[in-house]
Amino acid sequence: MTAAAAEPVTSGHRNEVYLVGEVITVPDERTFADGRDVVTFRIDVRTESESRPIRDSFDVTVANARSRKAALTWDVGDTVEIEGVVRRRFHRVGAGSRAFVVIEATRAKRLRR
């Protein structure tokens, strides 16, 4: 291995997400086409701006076993903390495809019911 190959690439780019929000759909376990088991749900994140409150909803997938197990115990209305990355996904719709964004959680925990 050369010295250049051993050094990490440092582009300055980052894909990190930290959200605290309210669960707005019942967490659902499913198996993706590639065989991965995941739990999916949506969260609502409310923030205040100077002019008005803002609500953003995010689709979240959780793949690691520990967080999947925890997410399956959550109820709509629970406040949760999500750490992860943003992923752009595609799926076929008729003759075309549709793009959507999902938060892929690497860590997820309930803060309060």
Regions found by a protein language model. Name each.
Residues 1-113:
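OB-fold and OB-like single-stranded nucleic-acid-recognition modules
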